């Protein structure tokens, strides 16, 4: 299972929580997407899926996979009232330490937000749907988002959400697999040399 985080956006560059807001790639993000295609090479996949958000779809296309099928379960974590804010800004407003991983999000004006468990359930649903492809010995390629893919990896590994410890840069390629029947991380946060 190969995972690609979308290329840089203005909000990812400035550390803003970018959940369901549809932010386009920057020029650097487009370059990162093309470089992800270099890392992927000419490898063949039994299924190619993407978040329906434009930053992931454009990354898929620029990485050489315009055929990627949008899957709504691949959207980023819904940050609710914290959408568009930075972690330092949230901490300053709250007046105490805060982590999206342990403290969660608040209801927003236009969206209720989402718990980490809700994101885990979405990730588990995707893993369940692609299992038949993997069982046939074919690879699956997924284009999505940083927090989502970190949670996805923790679900794959059957670990509690320790995803905050798995840094994932923009345009990075990662791979999950099995060793002796045990789910493992094969590669993490791989980018093409500049």
Report residues per predicted region.
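Loop-to-helix element that buttresses phosphate recognition and phosphoryl-transfer chemistry
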Residues: 1-59, 110-124
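Acidic, low-complexity terminal tails and accessory targeting/binding regions
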Residues: 79-89, 132, 136-138, 154-194
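Short, well-ordered beta-to-alpha junction loops that form the rim of enzyme active sites
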Residues: 7, 51-53, 73, 143-147
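Short glycine-enriched, charge-decorated loop/helix-capping segments at active-site entrances
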Residues: 16-24, 85-87, 106, 162
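Short glycine/proline- and acidic residue-enriched helix-loop micro-motifs
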Residues: 96-118
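GST superfamily/GST-like fold recognition
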Residues: 146-150, 179
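Generic beta-sheet signal
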Residues: 1, 138-146
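Phosphate-coordination/substrate-recognition cap region in phosphate-metabolizing enzymes
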Residues: 35-98
């Amino acid at each position: 299972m190969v995972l690609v985080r979308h290329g840089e956006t203005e909000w990812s560059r400035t550390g803003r929580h970018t959940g369901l807001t549809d932010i386009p790639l920057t020029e650097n993000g487009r370059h990162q997407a093309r470089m992800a295609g270099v890392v992927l090479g000419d490898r063949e996949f039994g299924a190619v899926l993407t978040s329906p958000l434009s930053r992931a779809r454009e990354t898929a296309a620029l990485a050489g996979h315009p055929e990627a099928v949008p899957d709504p379960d691949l959207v980023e974590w819904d940050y609710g009232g914290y959408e568009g804010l930075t972690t330092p800004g949230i901490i300053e407003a709250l007046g105490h330490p805060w982590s999206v991983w342990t403290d969660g999000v608040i209801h927003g004006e236009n969206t209720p937000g989402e718990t980490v468990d809700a994101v885990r359930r979405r990730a588990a649903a995707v893993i369940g749907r692609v299992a038949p492809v993997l069982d046939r010995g074919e690879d699956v390629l997924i284009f999505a988002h940083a927090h989502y893919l970190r949670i996805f990896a923790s679900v794959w590994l059957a670990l509690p959400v320790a995803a905050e410890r798995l840094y994932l840069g923009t345009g990075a390629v990662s791979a999950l697999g099995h060793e002796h029947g045990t789910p493992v991380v094969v590669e993490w946060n791989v980018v093409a040399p500049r």
